[in-house]
């Protein structure tokens, strides 16, 4: 009888995951798996690295962050545009990542770009109605939040989440701004991030528990269907996130629209969040208006054969 050699199972390291990575001069970086899911959003400086997201994405299940188009009509649908459940194409250049495709009669392109020198990140979503009739839709942005050292977060994500303080501020133009501060000291610093929608957010959530309640439990995607508003209530719980709902619009055939979601990160924010922190967003509007398109080669992401396999019963 032939004896099989011993098999050694090991946890894959970053070098084994074939990540695509973009970064800027401020130390901000975004890493993406071959399936186009966001693996990590990090800030590294002076030998210290802070994860802005809470959990690392997986090659099979992907990650928690994403952008969705929600389309109305007789059968409302929610379409994931980023990550393992998206069905479009993906590409990258030095300063940005791009997801693009067409689904349910809606053509889209998502561009994730970094400010060249500052801790600013932008998600630009462009859509075009390819249907023969006018169509109502909105967009939902979801980012899981950790704001800590990777070891601190992965030791107990729920514990780390409970130390994140959420503050809801109102900007004169951009409306709801979600501010999150890690109250558990990270080597003497208190990481902080703000999220908003340049065109104005009309709904929000601060924990995934709010996105997975009884009304959404049987939905295909956690963003819910068009017409289901985010709760717009602050919840401090075990799976912190910044979730924002855009204004709804109605697009005529061939008409296009654009939304830009953004984040502003500070590696150390000694004081609690307040309305005064809106001053940190002064350059956002200008940066959004100066967005420059770039030609990027796109290809089909690498999808695991296990990803779409039916669940065992």
Each model region followed by its residue ranges:
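Catalytic micro-motifs at enzyme active sites that drive phosphoryl/nucleotidyl and oxygen chemistry
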Residues: 86-87, 109-114, 245-249
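Low-complexity, acidic Ser/Thr/Pro/Gly-rich terminal tails and inter-domain linkers that flank the onset
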Residues: 95-117
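An extended acidic
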Residues: 3-102, 178-227
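Short beta-strand and strand-turn-strand segments in soluble, beta-rich domains
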Residues: 104-106, 152-161, 235-245
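Polysaccharide-binding surfaces and accessory modules of carbohydrate-active proteins
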Residues: 9, 113-225, 270-313
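Short acidic, Pro/Gly- and aromatic-enriched capping/linker segments at domain boundaries
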Residues: 6, 10-21, 230-252
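Short Pro-Gly-centered flexible turn/kink motifs
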Residues: 135, 249-267
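Intrinsic-disorder/low-complexity, polar/charged segments enriched in Ser/Thr/Lys/Arg/Asp/Glu/Gln
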Residues: 107, 120-122, 256-260
């Amino acid at each position: 009888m032939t004896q099989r050699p011993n098999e050694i199972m090991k946890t894959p390291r970053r070098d084994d995951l074939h990540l695509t990575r973009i970064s800027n001069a401020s130390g901000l970086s975004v890493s993406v798996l071959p399936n186009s899911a966001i693996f990590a959003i990090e800030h590294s400086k002076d030998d210290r690295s802070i994860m802005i997201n809470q959990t690392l994405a997986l090659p099979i299940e992907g990650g928690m962050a994403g952008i969705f188009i929600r389309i109305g009509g007789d059968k409302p649908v929610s379409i994931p545009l980023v990550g393992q459940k998206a069905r479009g194409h993906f590409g990258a250049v030095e300063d940005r990542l791009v997801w693009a495709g067409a689904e349910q009669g809606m053509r889209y392109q998502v561009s994730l770009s970094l400010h060249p020198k500052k801790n600013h990140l932008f998600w630009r979503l462009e859509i075009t109605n390819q249907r023969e009739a006018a169509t109502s839709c909105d967009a939902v942005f979801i980012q899981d939040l950790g704001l800590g050292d990777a070891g601190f977060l992965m030791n107990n994500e729920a514990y780390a989440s409970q130390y994140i303080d959420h503050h809801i501020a109102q900007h004169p133009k951009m409306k709801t701004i979600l501010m999150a501060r890690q109250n558990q000291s990270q080597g003497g610093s208190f990481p902080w991030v703000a999220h908003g929608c340049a065109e104005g957010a009309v709904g929000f959530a601060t924990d995934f528990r709010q996105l997975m309640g009884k009304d959404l439990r049987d939905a295909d995607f956690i963003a819910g269907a068009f017409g289901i508003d985010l709760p717009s209530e602050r919840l401090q719980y075990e799976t912190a996130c910044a979730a924002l709902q855009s204004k709804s619009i109605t697009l005529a055939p061939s008409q296009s629209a654009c939304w830009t979601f953004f984040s502003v990160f500070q590696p150390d924010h000694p004081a609690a969040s307040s309305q005064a922190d809106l001053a940190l967003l002064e350059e956002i509007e200008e940066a959004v208006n100066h967005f420059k398109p770039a030609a990027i080669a796109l290809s089909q992401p690498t999808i695991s054969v296990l990803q779409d396999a039916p669940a065992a019963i």
